[in-house]
Amino acid sequence: MSIVAVGINHKTAPVAVREKISFNPDKLSIALQEMLNAVQCREVAILSTCNRTELYLVQDGDFDVTQQRLIKWLESFHNVPASTILPSLYWHKDQQAVNHMMRVACGLDSLVLGEPQILGQMKQAYSQAKAAGSMSLIMDRLFQRTFGVAKQVRTETEIGASAVSVAFASVNLAKHIFGGLEKTKVLLVGAGETIELVAKHLYENNVGKITVANRTLARAENMATKIGADVITLAQIPEHMCNADIVISSTGSTLPIIGKGMVEQALASRKHQPIFMVDLAVPRDIEEQVSELEDVFLYTVDDLQGIIAKNIANRRKAAVQAESIVNSQSDNFMAWLRGLNTQDTVISYRKQCLDNRDVLLEKAFIQLKNGKNSEAVLAELANKLTNKFMHAPTSALQSAAQGGELDKLIYLRDIFNIDSQE
């Protein structure tokens, strides 16, 4: 029995290749059942995200045969030639597979080192496999242990503590300055991808109120509905800025949208209560001279890049600690798995012995019922049991001796405790 992880990700293939073997969530249950049958394995799970598709298997067969079956199934299921995906596939087996799964869950293999979203995606993959009935004892235990490792890494290292995107860094900086965002009012200028991410982080941090200003209201309204924000036009910014404790801007404008005079008026209306401002745009949305105002804390994208560079360095240090935790926990899982294999062997051997005993006992009972001498029956039973239990070990010892397999012979003598009996 072995554990296998096979996949394709952002490091091994461009999106044009990755999208060819991504799995539609609506068809995942069918895919899991098909894979079980086509690849002839015990258990399977599938993780499919925009950056990676990975298949996790527990199988009994020859590894090379499993590889061939899996590639053939991927070809058939996705209607894509093997030559398109084979160069991008990576394969891990047993402890390497366990180690890989744990690294993925901890964000150590992610495009953004330490990102937490992958753990949620792995939990979803686990739930889908459970619901499809494609997962049993070993894969279930592996996923549970993997989730535990990810939690341990988050708790014991700083892998996720530092912001490594300008959107996340902006919100973190605001949170640090205000000590919490629950009572703050935020004005977001723009409605592009960066501002959407900022809005998402603000919403997750329970910010007091968000107002979105954009040139076209339709796009801003689409975003605002998701986070319960108000929407205004760019022309309305001057009358609303006085209400904002935080202003974060990122538009595609070629000229500044927020000037020094506009901010001065807002500060006067606020009785010079400070405003925290972040300009994420290039070219800048906020005039450089705004930084001269005493009650304004203005940060540009360059200021944040400096913070992010330090944070990335901190994450890399934390990643070294995380790798150590992963290695230790994958060792623990493999020890559990070996124990499970030993237990299976003991159970199988015990069942075999009990079956042999029951057959011989049944014959002995018949002999006793037929009036045969009880001592003779017991002697015959003991003799047959001894011969039965001695047959396999005797054959193994003779085979090892005749084949000159000294190591095997010593091992067998140790197993049967022969030398200590002499």
Curated annotation (Swiss-Prot):
Matches recorded under InterPro entries: 4pyrrol_synth_GluRdtase, 4pyrrol_synth_GluRdtase_dimer, 4pyrrol_synth_GluRdtase_N, GluRdtase_CS, GluRdtase_dimer_dom_sf, GluRdtase_N_sf, NAD(P)-bd_dom_sf, Shikm_DH/Glu-tRNA_Rdtase
EC primary class: oxidoreductase
Catalytic activity: (S)-4-amino-5-oxopentanoate + tRNA(Glu) + NADP(+) = L-glutamyl-tRNA(Glu) + NADPH + H(+)
Family annotation (SUPFAM superfamilies): Glutamyl tRNA-reductase catalytic, N-terminal domain (SSF69742), Glutamyl tRNA-reductase dimerization domain (SSF69075), NAD(P)-binding Rossmann-fold domains (SSF51735)
EC number: 1.2.1.70
Gene Ontology molecular function, alphabetical: glutamyl-tRNA reductase activity; NADP binding
Name of one Pfam family that matches: GlutR_N
Protein residues bound to substrate: T49, C50, N51, R52, S110, E115, P116, Q117, Q121
Record-linked CDD domains: NAD_bind_Glutamyl_tRNA_reduct (cd05213)
Protein's GO biological process: protoporphyrinogen IX biosynthetic process from glutamate
Catalytic residue list: C50
Keywords (A to Z) from UniProt: NADP, Oxidoreductase, Porphyrin biosynthesis
Site keyed Important for activity: positions: H100
Binding site for NADP(+): G190, A191, G192, E193, T194, I195
Keyword NADP carried by entry: yes
Taxonomy, superkingdom: Bacteria
Gene3D superfamilies (alphabetical): Glutamyl-tRNA reductase, N-terminal domain (3.30.460.30), NAD(P)-binding Rossmann-like Domain (3.40.50.720)
Involved pathway(s): Porphyrin-containing compound metabolism; protoporphyrin-IX biosynthesis; 5-aminolevulinate from L-glutamyl-tRNA(Glu): step 1/2
Note: During catalysis, the active site Cys acts as a nucleophile attacking the alpha-carbonyl group of tRNA-bound glutamate with the formation of a thioester intermediate between enzyme and glutamate, and the concomitant release of tRNA(Glu). The thioester intermediate is finally reduced by direct hydride transfer from NADPH, to form the product GSA.
NCBIfam families: hemA
This protein's domain notes: Possesses an unusual extended V-shaped dimeric structure with each monomer consisting of three distinct domains arranged along a curved 'spinal' alpha-helix. The N-terminal catalytic domain specifically recognizes the glutamate moiety of the substrate. The second domain is the NADPH-binding domain, and the third C-terminal domain is responsible for dimerization.
PANTHER family: GLUTAMYL-TRNA REDUCTASE
Subunit details: Homodimer.
Function noted in UniProt: Catalyzes the NADPH-dependent reduction of glutamyl-tRNA(Glu) to glutamate 1-semialdehyde (GSA).
Family listed: Belongs to the glutamyl-tRNA reductase family.
Name assigned to this protein: Glutamyl-tRNA reductase
